Structures are given as C-alpha cells and as structure tokens.
Amino acid sequence: MKITSISVQQKNKERYNIFIDEKYNFSVDEEVLARYQLMKGKALTEAEIEEIKQADMVRKGLNKAINFLSHRVRSEKEIRDYLKKQEMEAFAIDEILKKLADMDYINDLEFAELYTKTQIKTTLKGPRTIERELVEKGLTREIISQVIEEYSDEAQLENATKQAIKIMKRNNKSAKKMLQQKIITDLIQKGYTSELAKTAATEATSEIDIADEADILQKQVEKTMRKNKRYKPSIAKQKTITSLMQKGFSYDTIQSYLTENEISFEEEE
C-alpha cells in the first residue's frame, strides 16, 4: 500500500488527509505527519497504518487536554474523565496523561494546594466539605491530609462566623436558642465540626440580648395571634403557644409574656 496523495484539510490547516492507493484512508496532525515522514509514494503496511492512527489519536487527545487545561488547573482524574467523554481509548488516555505529567501540566499536589487556598479565600465552606470535594476530584488521602492543614483554626472560625451571621439574618424571627441551633446545624452541613459550629453560633449571636429577644417575641405573638384569631379562644391560644415554641421560645417564657402583658384570647363582646 502506497500513499498516493496528501492534502491539507480546509477547516484545520494543521491536519492532513492521507490517501492510500487513490482512496482516502485517514487523517493526521502535522506533528504526526512529520514524525512518521509521511509523503507521496511512501509504502505502508497495515500495522504501520494502525500505529500512525494510534499516534494521531494520542496527539489529538493531547491537544484537547491542553486546551481543557487552559481554562484552569485540573486534577489527573478530571483530565482522565474529560478524555473519556471525548471517547479516547484507554491506551491513548494513559499515554496522554504521561505526556502531560512530563510537561508539568499535571501535579495533583499543586492542584490540591491551589484549590484549597481558593476555597478558603473565596467561599465559606468548612474543611470537611473541601475534603469531600478533593476526594471527588481524585486526590489521594495523603495529599488531602497535607493540604487541608492550610485551613487554620483561625480561618475556619472566621469563615464559620461569617456564614453564621448570614444564617442569623435569614432567621431573625426565631428565639436565640433556636437560632443558635439552626446555625450549628447549617454549619455542620457545610463541613464544619460541631465544636467549631457551636463557637461560631455563640460568636454570631453574642449581641442578641434579652431586650432583643423580647422584641422578637412581641412581634411573633402579635403575628401569630392575628393568624389564629379565626379559631375559638382555647384553640387560638393553643396554636399560638405551639407556634411560638416551634420558633424556640420556652413555654414558661411565653406564659410569662402573655401574663405580664395581660394578653387574653377571650372573644370580644
């Protein structure tokens, strides 16, 4: 079998169409063309053609991977998953990853360090959430343990407290006790330890005093009573107390407030 013609592709000037015995057979990257010294009149065996095709697949995948990396740093697993989606064969993926490593395009430790620093500075995620994300990106436990140490206790508390203040602003109609519990629960879900979550909750709610809580209770009593006034007095009272307790106010606090303010649920005559 001989190469009878070589032509440049119209849409990609760096790729060439190879014709064997007057018929199109395959296309190659410019680098592969030069490496295998492909030219008109050169004889090729089937085995050589297959080798060239495989080399071109690697070259094509390498170009795709480098372009993929141009947007941001990636872990080895992210690149492998990307190449699989590009329908690259296993042998090609392994060779591409080796070439990328040799070219210093892949370094999971550097990736993990950069990713962790970015998450600490730009998000309010807890360390456990960052650890989980690194696992999903294919990082080893050894690397994860090494880089997560960069998330100091001080930085964790600072971020957790910022997150706690956000949670507090969204739930400012609840009693202090329930608000703290809500903050703790949310912070644990965001990857912080229960101990640090409790500290952040205390810090965020430290300025809420008895007067503030009394004001919140007053507003909630008025709102809940308006909502329940269509019920019979006994039912309205029960529903009001239940609703207030669900917002974190204790039964004794509610009863004291109702008594001190002479609030009655009797029907008006």
From Swiss-Prot:
One Pfam family matching this protein: RecX_HTH3
Keyword Cytoplasm: yes
A GO CC term attached to the entry: cytoplasm
Compartment(s) of residence: Cytoplasm
Database matches in Gene3D superfamilies: Winged helix-like DNA-binding domain superfamily/Winged helix DNA-binding domain
Keywords: Cytoplasm
GO biological process terms, semicolon-separated: regulation of DNA repair
UniProt keyword Cytoplasm, yes or no: yes
Function: Modulates RecA activity.
NCBIfam families, alphabetized: PRK14135.1
Entry's family note: Belongs to the RecX family.
Name of the featured protein: Regulatory protein RecX
